[in-house]
Amino acid sequence: MGFSYDRYSRMISNPVRNYWALIAGRHDTNAFSVIDAAYREPQRRYHDWGHIVDLLTKLDCLKALAVRPDLIAAAIFWHDAVYVTRDDDGLLRPDAENVRASATLFERHSKFDETDAQAIHDLIMATANHLNARATVEHYPGFSRDLDLFLDLDLSSLGASWSEFEQNLARLRFEYAWVPEPLFCLGRLQMIDTFAAHGDALYRLDETRKLWCARAHQNLARAQAELRRQVARLASSA
């Protein structure tokens, strides 16, 4: 019941339709409406339906690597369901708070059995620390690998073409439009430096490393250089 083809078939892409049809019966009837409203929020430009479609499309291509693609798909649908860049007091909201809120929202609408629900919860929570998160419980044989695949998918946009990478940076800038330019550039540079410092360990699986790692580091190096020039220019004009 949770998914209506009549209502959504003209609005959303095939990966969304197909994967939601796979897991709709393990959600309450309001779940898709909640997700749909979230990813259409006007303050989003990167963390919107485009991001979800991208991840589901890649999951579909790489599903032979997954033990439970249905659970990975559920985590994809919910992992950015709550995305707010600043709190009511105007301060930067930590990503971890959005992740926790997204996991809680999933639990509110889930009808998965207890083991599967906890696995999805842990997949979502792992996005609070992409580079260092590890499975602490093997919810099913192969869960650790599914977690690694899910996190690699979420970072796959780093290995996009340069033009898409640039567009993603612009989309993120829109989401943080309230942050002054010097602070935003410094924050982006710190994030990119962290990704770049991980070398081949940026991606966890051999298969995804071969797909995205080389291009990702080319993009990161180019972005580092451009952001450093921008930071220097902003500092000199201050």
What kind of feature is each model-predicted range?
Residues 47, 51, 79, 98:
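Histidine-centered active-site/metal-ligand motif
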Residues 30, 67, 71-73, 97, ...:
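Alpha-helix N-cap and coil->helix boundary residues
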Residues 21-37, 51:
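Short alpha-helical hairpin
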Residues 2-19, 40-47, 58-68, 78, ...:
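Divalent metal-dependent phosphate-bond-processing catalytic cores, especially two-metal-ion Mg2+/Mn2+ enzymes
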Residues 105-132, 136:
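Polymerase palm active-site segment centered on the conserved acidic dipeptide of motif C
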Residues 88-94:
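Metal-dependent catalytic cores of enzymes that make or break cyclic nucleotides
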Residues 55, 95-111:
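An active-site-proximal "capping" alpha-helix that borders the catalytic cofactor pocket
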